[in-house]
Amino acid sequence: MARIAGVNIPDHKHVVIALTAIYGIGKTTSLKLCKTVDIDPSVKVSQLSDAQLESLRTEIAKITVEGDLRRVVTMNIKRLMDLGCYRGLRHRRGLPLRGQRTKTNARTRKGRRKGTSS
């Protein structure tokens, strides 16, 4: 297994799909990376040479991925909460942020029903 950005990349998968195992890299970014490094996207990871893997590592190092990206996202949410803006308040209360209805539905965000006491 190749190790890129602290993540074990599966050997048996195509490069484009295998790179999506890294948090912050989707299919589009993966395709762009393959194009920049001149790697055929349909090649399996096990068939890549050490030089190709190293060039992939250097390109991925230029992108914010994994722990750094998680930290940035967390800090952005914390900033919204500290500002006290609408989105920050919704985060704080554990409610949907983007205008969805909450009278019914929104169970994923709100959690399980509390139940009515009679």
Swiss-Prot record:
Belongs to the universal ribosomal protein uS13 family. It comes from Legionella pneumophila subsp. pneumophila (strain Philadelphia 1 / ATCC 33152 / DSM 7513). One of its GO terms (molecular function) is rRNA binding. Keywords: Ribonucleoprotein, Ribosomal protein, RNA-binding, rRNA-binding, tRNA-binding. Part of the 30S ribosomal subunit. Forms a loose heterodimer with protein S19. Forms two bridges to the 50S subunit in the 70S ribosome. Signal peptide: none annotated. Located at the top of the head of the 30S subunit, it contacts several helices of the 16S rRNA. In the 70S ribosome it contacts the 23S rRNA (bridge B1a) and protein L5 of the 50S subunit (bridge B1b), connecting the 2 subunits; these bridges are implicated in subunit movement. Contacts the tRNAs in the A and P-sites. Gene3D superfamilies: 1.10.8.50, 30s ribosomal protein s13, domain 2. This is Small ribosomal subunit protein uS13. Residues 94-118 are annotated as: Disordered. PANTHER family: 30S RIBOSOMAL PROTEIN S13/40S RIBOSOMAL PROTEIN S18, SMALL RIBOSOMAL SUBUNIT PROTEIN US13M. GO terms for cellular component: cytosol; small ribosomal subunit. GO terms for biological process: translation. SUPFAM superfamilies: S13-like H2TH domain.
